[in-house]
Every structure is written in structure tokens, then in C-alpha cells.
């Protein structure tokens, strides 16, 4: 009896042991648990601490509650915030106030930020939560000069305790950035990027010490709720769900750190139509908070959001205006014998065109004034299209951030109000052409008979290269035949060539029909729209020390 009991007991124990060994795998197959991101990487948010200490502490605790283990601060935290981060076990990455700086200005910018660095190091001696210092955000890290500066300041940070690690935040692609080995870690600014994780993996193939410094997309305040509405709060949440979930690909290692941009909307963003916060400026949470909490804590990976109503079809006003101008141009050509004859003379027999202009008979001022209106309208409509396309491109914000505040405010206001851009561009074109025409007519009258009707023909007809810009602008868009980047290239290159052509053709025709000295004609070229516009750009770049090369690299090497 005892032997039988012992055999049964031993058999039962063996079966229980086998069950215990295989139970975890069996239970995982039935109800798989979600991996916690804190096991493999530090996840956090970008944060600007409020000036109120109580508000700052409250927000920091809420970040810890949603599963954040790191915080990237855009300014120096107060002692109370650092102390609370110590107790919460958070890692603090603190940016120095060095933002969108070209290579020649980086050393001076870091020297000005040196007092902030010293205060940060003093704070870090008392608070182990402060582990990293950001030397620069969106500096021109595509040139070796920047790398040398960052390397010297990294050595300076390492030279004295505490042992802070350095990083910089960059929007540039891995193929363009050259300074990864100048700091301890590189953080990528991939806000608005269509494939942020792919951008990080491209970087990861070049260097191991690279994380995500700013992930997210913007919410447009005027957007209707629902996934069908572009840049709605729900679309922001879906973007973060897809981006953060891809970090848990079991076949690849995740980044060492990733920050969602940002905890709360900025008070004064570069573009007021772009709000990146998980909360609005008043502290009200958006649906993206639920996504971040679920993924950061490892409790949820799939989320449902309302689709909302289908967005209303955009206004056709600009399209009707654009093609209306094209139709009006065709109507003028079909109904006006003067226009048809002048077209033939202008393009096939320029000598006869100049003879007719010199004689000044039957110039039809009304038809030429209408042509001037079409040119001005085409420029205005093209400006509206360009502003609307710029408002939808992530790169626009980076370029604007690198401009001096007065210029930034003007351009940002124009991008946010495209109709105003069209009116201003059209008005400027009309005013500048009118000013130039008036000067040409008045000077010509000193030596010969020259009417304003002749001046109108002289200035308007060489402006024909402006007209193709309108259909090109109407055909440009993210899913249109002409991509936004190609349109920008055509607008910039074609616009410069058109300005040179108009200036040269007007001055040559003017010299041929007035017999004025060449020096006088060249002096009158100073009042051309090309010369005045170039002078304005040169003045602004010199006065504000703007690096055109840096702006170009931000526009072309960050997408």
C-alpha cells in the first residue's frame, strides 16, 4: 500500500513538473503578452517645462505614468524638476539653446550657451537623472567645420565631472550628415517624415549610437475630427501607432532612445497651423496620448479611432481662376488682330517688332493692359499654389526656423494665408513693372518721342515666360503629375531664368529703339524687378548673416 502510494505520488510529481516546464510556452500561445519597451530602449517625450514649478512637477509625473523613462527638455530644468526626475527614475536629455545654426556661427553660438552648460553641469552633480546634454539642434552637420566644433565641445564636456554624454539633434539624412563620430549620440528629428523608422534604420547602418530625437506629425487646429481628415488628432495618433509599433520588429534591434514630439503644443510655433503636442496649449489631451501610454507601458499595440466624415472637396476657386486666365489669353489672341500680328513679329521677326514699337502706331493700349493683367494674375495664382504646397511640406518648417525672426514671421504668415501671398505677389509685380516702365518712358522722352503705350508694349511682351508657370503650378501637388519638389525646382530655376530673360530683352529692345547710350540703358536696368529683388535679398542675407548654402541643404537634404 505504501509502495503503491509512493509510486503514484512520484508519478504525479513528475507530471506536475513537466506541466510547469511547458506551461509558460502554452500560456503565451493562448494569450501573448506585449513586450515592454523599457526592456530594450528608453522611451520618452520632448518637453518644455512650464514656468510654474507645480505645473512642471505635475506634467513630469504624468509622463512617468504613461510609461516614459526619458525626457528630452528644450531648456534647462529647475532643481525641483531634476529632483523629482531622480525619484521617478527618469533620464533627462537637456538641449542647449543652439538651434538651426550654420557652421560658421556654431562656435559663437556654443560660446554664448556656455553659461547654460555650466549651470547644467552644476545641476547634474546633484541629480543623477541628468545624463545627456544636447550641443545643437538642426545645426549644419553636413560640413566638416561643424564636426570639429562639436568634437571640441564634447571633449570640454567630458573633461570635468559629472560625466555627461553629448548628442545633437539632426534632420539630415545619413548620407548627408558627417558628424556622428563627433558626439556620443545622434538623435534624429523625423517629425512629419512619411517613414521615420526607415530613416532611423538607414542611419543605424552607418552608426550604432543613433536614436530618435523627435517623432510625430502635426495637428492642424482647423482639421475636422476623424481619420479621414488630414492632420486631425486621430491621424496624429495613427501616425504614432504605426511608427512606434515598428520599433518592436523582433528581427531588428530597437533604438537606444526614442522621443515623441512633443508633450504639449508650443506657445509660439514657427507655423501656427502645426501643433505637435500630445496635449494642446491648455493641457487637454489628444488621442495620441492613449497610443503613447499603451505602447510605452506594453499594454496595448492596436488602437481604434473614429473615421469621421469625409472631408469636403477643396475650393475650385483657384483652379477656375487659373484656367480662366488661360482661356482669357486664348480669347485675346483669337479676337485681337494686333495680338496675333505682334506674336508673329515678336517670335519670328524681332526687327519688325522693334520697328513697329519705334513708330508707335496702333499699339492698342487696352489689349496690352489686359495682357499685363493676365501676367500679374498668373504670378499671383502661382504664388497661391506655391504657398499651399509649402504649407503641406515638413521641410518648410525647418527652412523657416533657420531664418531671422522678422523674415520668418513674414514668410510664415504668407504660407498660412496663401490668398494674401497671391495678392502681394501680384501687386508687387504690377508695381515694380510700372515703376520700371515709367522710368524707361521718362528717360526716353528726353531724346525722342516715346509714349506710355510704347512703354507698356516694351515691358509686357517680354514677360511671356511667366505664363507657363500657371499651368505648371495648377498641375503640382503630392499626388499630381508634378511633385512639390519638382515644382519648387522649376519655380526657382525657371523663375530666375525668366527674370534674366525679361530684363535682357527689355533693355535690348529699349536700346535699339531709343538710340540711348549703353551706359544709360544699363543704369536703367538697376530699376528692373530682377535688380531690385536681388538687392533686397542681398541686403537681408548680409544684414542678418543668413547662410544661403545652409538653407539650401535644409531644403534638399532633410526630406
Task: Name each model-derived stretch.
Residues 154-175, 211-215, 259-262:
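Aromatic-lined carbohydrate-recognition surfaces of secreted/lumenal glycan-active proteins
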Residues 117-144:
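Active-site groove signature of glycoside hydrolases
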Residues 59-63, 68-102, 149-164:
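Aromatic-lined substrate-binding rim segments of carbohydrate-active enzymes
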Residues 261-311, 316-320:
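Aromatic-rich peripheral "rim/lid" segments of glycoside hydrolase catalytic domains that contact
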Amino acid at each position: 500500500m505504501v509502495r503503491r502510494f509512493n509510486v503514484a505520488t512520484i508519478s504525479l510529481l513528475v507530471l506536475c513538473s513537466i506541466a510547469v516546464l511547458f506551461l509558460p510556452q502554452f500560456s503565451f500561445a493562448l494569450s501573448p503578452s506585449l513586450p515592454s519597451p523599457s526592456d530594450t530602449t528608453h522611451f520618452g517625450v520632448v518637453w518644455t517645462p512650464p514656468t510654474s514649478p507645480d505645473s512642471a512637477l505635475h506634467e513630469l509625473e504624468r509622463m512617468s505614468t504613461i510609461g516614459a523613462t526619458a525626457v528630452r527638455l528644450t531648456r534647462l530644468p529647475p532643481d525641483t524638476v531634476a529632483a523629482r526626475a531622480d525619484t521617478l527614475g527618469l533620464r533627462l536629455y537637456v538641449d542647449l539653446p543652439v538651434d538651426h545654426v550654420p557652421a560658421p556661427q556654431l562656435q559663437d553660438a556654443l560660446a554664448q550657451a556656455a553659461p547654460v552648460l555650466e549651470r547644467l553641469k552644476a545641476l547634474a552633480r546633484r541629480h543623477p537623472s541628468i545624463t545627456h546634454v544636447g550641443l545643437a539642434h538642426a545645426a549644419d552637420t553636413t560640413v566638416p567645420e561643424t564636426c570639429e566644433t562639436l568634437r571640441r565641445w564634447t571633449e570640454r564636456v567630458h573633461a570635468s565631472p559629472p560625466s555627461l554624454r553629448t548628442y545633437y539633434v539632426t534632420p539630415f539624412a545619413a548620407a548627408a550628415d558627417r558628424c556622428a563620430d563627433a558626439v556620443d549620440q545622434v538623435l534624429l528629428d523625423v517629425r512629419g517624415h512619411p517613414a521615420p523608422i526607415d530613416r532611423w534604420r538607414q542611419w543605424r547602418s552607418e552608426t550604432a549610437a543613433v536614436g530618435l530625437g523627435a517623432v510625430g506629425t502635426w495637428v492642424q487646429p482647423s482639421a475636422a475630427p476623424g481619420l479621414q481628415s488630414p492632420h486631425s488628432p486621430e491621424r496624429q495618433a495613427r501616425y504614432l501607432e504605426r511608427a512606434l509599433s515598428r520599433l518592436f520588429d523582433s528581427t531588428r534591434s530597437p533604438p537606444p532612445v526614442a522621443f515623441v514630439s512633443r508633450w504639449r503644443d508650443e506657445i509660439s510655433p514657427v507655423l501656427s497651423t502645426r501643433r505637435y503636442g500630445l496635449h494642446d496649449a491648455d493641457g487637454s489631451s489628444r488621442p495620441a496620448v492613449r497610443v503613447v501610454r499603451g505602447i510605452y507601458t506594453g499594454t496595448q499595440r492596436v488602437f481604434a479611432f473614429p473615421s469621421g466624415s469625409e472631408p469636403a472637396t477643396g475650393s475650385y476657386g483657384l483652379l477656375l481662376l487659373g484656367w480662366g486666365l488661360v482661356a482669357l489669353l486664348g480669347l485675346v489672341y483669337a479676337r485681337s488682330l494686333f495680338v496675333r500680328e505682334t506674336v508673329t513679329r515678336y517670335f519670328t521677326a524681332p526687327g519688325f517688332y522693334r520697328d513697329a514699337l519705334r513708330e508707335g502706331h496702333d499699339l492698342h493700349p487696352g489689349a496690352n493692359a489686359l495682357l499685363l493683367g493676365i501676367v500679374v494674375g498668373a504670378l499671383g495664382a502661382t504664388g497661391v499654389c506655391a504657398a499651399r504646397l509649402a504649407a503641406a511640406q515638413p521641410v518648410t518648417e525647418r527652412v523657416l526656423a533657420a531664418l531671422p525672426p522678422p523674415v520668418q514671421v513674414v514668410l510664415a504668415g504668407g504660407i498660412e494665408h496663401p490668398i494674401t501671398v497671391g495678392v502681394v505677389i501680384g501687386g508687387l509685380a504690377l508695381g515694380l513693372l510700372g515703376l520700371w516702365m515709367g522710368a524707361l518712358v521718362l528717360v526716353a522722352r528726353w531724346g525722342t518721342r516715346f509714349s506710355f503705350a510704347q512703354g507698356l508694349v516694351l515691358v509686357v511682351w517680354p514677360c511671356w515666360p511667366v505664363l507657363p508657370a500657371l499651368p505648371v503650378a495648377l498641375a503640382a501637388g503630392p499626388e499630381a503629375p508634378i511633385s512639390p519638389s519638382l515644382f519648387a525646382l522649376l519655380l526657382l530655376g525657371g523663375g530666375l531664368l525668366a527674370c534674366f530673360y525679361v530684363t535682357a530683352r527689355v533693355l535690348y529692345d529699349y536700346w535699339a529703339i531709343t538710340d540711348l547710350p549703353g551706359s544709360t540703358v544699363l543704369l536703367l536696368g538697376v530699376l528692373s524687378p530682377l535688380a531690385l529683388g536681388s538687392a533686397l535679398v542681398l541686403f537681408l542675407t548680409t544684414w542678418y548673416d543668413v547662410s544661403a548654402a545652409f538653407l539650401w541643404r535644409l531644403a534638399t537634404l532633410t526630406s
